[in-house]
Amino acid sequence: MAQTLAQTKQISQSHTFDVSQSHHKTPDDTNSHSVIYSTQNLDLWYGENHALQNINLDIYENQITAIIGPSGCGKSTYIKTLNRMVELVPSVKTAGKILYRDQDIFDQKYSKEQLRTNVGMVFQQPNPFPKSIYDNITYGPKIHGIKNKKVLDEIVEKSLRGAAIWDELKDRLHTNAYSLSGGQQQRVCIARCLAIEPEVILMDEPTSALDPISTLRVEELVQELKEKYTIIMVTHNMQQAARVSDKTAFFLNGYVNEYDDTDKIFSNPSNKKTEDYISGRFG
């Protein structure tokens, strides 16, 4: 399977991009992790609404980056630029660059479909397809041309194990995913994402609709997943950001107000507005 999917993940290297003039907001200690995403001077508008302003942000491989900030600050808009889902909004326009492994994802030669193979997404509300658990997991691999049932069976088991839900569901694979609890549905959605072997997983408030026990399970899963994947998570939950993330970016009014190691953001922020937000003075 890995070889088959890898063949679908080859991106043209026919042109390079000059990044020498850019400036990034980056934590002081990168812990030797490589930059996988580099956002450079990004602005975004919904019609006349200037939703993101001069965003400069480096995301590091195999780390969990939390995106925090009050409602309407641009958090969800930002992560939807990372896989270009934001382009589904007709009035949207952008300026600046987002480099994914040194390639500008806004370049017309860059494949949007390829990007979404490399960068999976888990949404706020669990959104399984109205199909069996098995068909949910195999949906992506089948689109990529995998038809062999033995291979598909292996993908299902591997993905559900990766989402820490195989033991719960291994005898129910042909049950409709809608019959599961909210927490189980969300982990099936994570497994569906893992089935296409992404490098990055975007999570937009992945536990906000879940009960505390399901939330804890998803948080534990996210911590395990960073061994193989880069995780970028939007959350309103300050305690969650502090518990699970390595880096935290605080967005405010469309800007990155502060970006640093999570421990520093929550113990000794550099910016007064960051301190006010995480201490609950506004938000």
From Swiss-Prot:
GO terms for molecular function: ATP binding; ATP hydrolysis activity; ATPase-coupled phosphate ion transmembrane transporter activity. InterPro entries: AAA+_ATPase (IPR003593), ABC_transporter-like_ATP-bd (IPR003439), ABC_transporter-like_CS (IPR017871), P-loop_NTPase (IPR027417), PstB-like (IPR005670). Residues 1-32 are annotated as: Disordered. PROSITE patterns: ABC_TRANSPORTER_1, ABC_TRANSPORTER_2, PSTB. ATP binds at G69, P70, S71, G72, C73, G74, K75, S76. It is an enzyme of class 7 (translocase). One of its GO terms (cellular component) is plasma membrane. It is found in: Cell membrane. It comes from Staphylococcus aureus (strain NCTC 8325 / PS 47). Its EC number is 7.3.2.1. Belongs to the ABC transporter superfamily. Phosphate importer (TC 3.A.1.7) family. Residues 1-20 have a biased composition (Polar residues). Part of the ABC transporter complex PstSACB involved in phosphate import. Responsible for energy coupling to the transport system. Keywords: ATP-binding, Cell membrane, Membrane, Nucleotide-binding, Phosphate transport, Translocase, Transport. It is a peripheral membrane protein. Residues 37-278 form the ABC transporter domain. It catalyses: phosphate(out) + ATP + H2O = ADP + 2 phosphate(in) + H(+). One of its GO terms (biological process) is phosphate ion transmembrane transport. The complex is composed of two ATP-binding proteins (PstB), two transmembrane proteins (PstC and PstA) and a solute-binding protein (PstS). Pfam families: ABC_tran. This is Phosphate import ATP-binding protein PstB.
